[in-house]
Structure formats: C-alpha cells, structure tokens
Amino acid sequence: MIEICCGSYEDALNAYYGGAKRIELNSALHLGGLTPSIGSLKLTKNTTNLKVICMVRPRGAGFCYTDIEFKQMMIEAKDLLENGADGIAFGFLLKNNEIDIERTKEMVSLIKSYQKEAVFHRAYDCVKDPYASIEILINLGIDRLLTSGLRAKAADGKDLIKKLQTKYGDKIEILAGSGINSTNGQAIMEYTGIAQIHSSCKDWQNDQTTSGEFVNYCYGPAEHKDDFDMVSKELVEKLVKLGL
C-alpha cells in the first residue's frame, strides 16, 4: 500500500490520477502538516474513491498541547469524521516526550465511535523509548503507526522499523514515511518487511506573486523562493508502477 501525503484538494487529485489508493490529507505541509479544511475533504470524497486519512494538528512544532488546543483538535476530528474522513492521524506527547495516554485514549474513543481508523503520526519519532511507546499505542487501540524509525529519514531509521515490524507487525500496522520515493521505496519495504509506505511525491510550482518589492512570502529553499510545493502526478505514477 502506498499512501500519498497531500496538502490540498489539488494534491489529492494528483495523487488519485497518479494511481494512489489512500492519502493523508493535510494543510500547510511546510509546517509538517496541519488540519485540512472541510472543503478539501468534501471535494476529495465527492470526486474520487480515495481512502482519506485526515491530519488533526492545530499548529507546527511539537505535540504537547494546551487544553485549548486539545479542545480544538477534538472538535476538528469530529467534524472531519462527520464529513467522510476514513481515519484520523494525530499525536499527543507529554512534556517528557512520552505518549500522552489520556488524550490519546480520548481521541481513539472518538474515532472508534465512527468505526474509522486511528493513526498515530510521527510524533512517535520524538519519543525516547520506541518499544514502550509502541506497546502503549497498541494497548490504546491505535490501528497504524507512521514512523521514520526515530530518524530524520526512514532510510536511516530502517533498522528500527524492521525491529518494530518483526516484533509488533501482527498487532499494529507499521507505515514508514519521510524521504521515501520511487528510488528507495521498494528497498525499504523489502528490508523492513513492512507492507505500507508514505510519500509526499513533492514537486514545486511557481507563483510570481510570492514576492513583492519589499515583502516575500517564500517558505521554500532559495532555489524555490517563488514556488510552492505540491504533489506530482508523475512522481506518484513512478511509485505506483513499482507495484508495492
């Protein structure tokens, strides 16, 4: 299974026409992915047969949220589930980088009340003890874990991913993500034994209105100073053609 990380409805269409079957729908991917709009979800569900896992994340940076942020996240998750989300991707950590059990339990309970999938995202890659943490997630009813093996890129964390798959793969789905593409996806899957990968298939598109004479809304690297990132249908096709 190949899951494409999308930041908009247009990204979702590119993933769909590239042959993807499942996406993680976000907004603001340059911040690591934030909660998508209801509009992008409804359009995706109304015009494609994609399975859509929606991110619920109110801001960039870490995963230890205030009570106000948590309340917002629960309301957004409910709204997304009410409007057709096939699952919710989320992550809660305590200040000491351990899993926030109570908040995770509450979110899982909400998701399961709609009979949808609970996915714990790469907040997991900030924990100190990957084995104790995944056991907590399993006991809380998490269906799938997105991880890069606690490294910046999944290729560098493949040894841990393999160990997690070997030890826990019959209890929780392991989804490898970060830096995966058509050149390394198959090798990572074969090495680790996992059956799922997560990829952004990212390319850049120019928008000259990014810069004015005295202002600049650029967020990309210098070579893409007037560009925004988007899913490339062609890169999705290359990944899908591997038959993973």
What are these regions (language model features)?
Residues 15, 80, 107, 121, ...:
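Conserved, mostly hydrophobic/aromatic
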Residues 39, 44, 50-104:
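Glycine/small-residue-rich loop that forms an oxyanion/phosphate-binding "nest" at active or ligand-binding sites
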Residues 24-34, 79, 83-95, 142-155, ...:
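Glycine-rich phosphate-binding active-site loops on the catalytic face of alpha/beta enzymes
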Residues 18-23, 48-50, 84-87, 113-115, ...:
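Glycine-enriched alpha-helix->loop->beta-strand junction motifs that scaffold or abut catalytic
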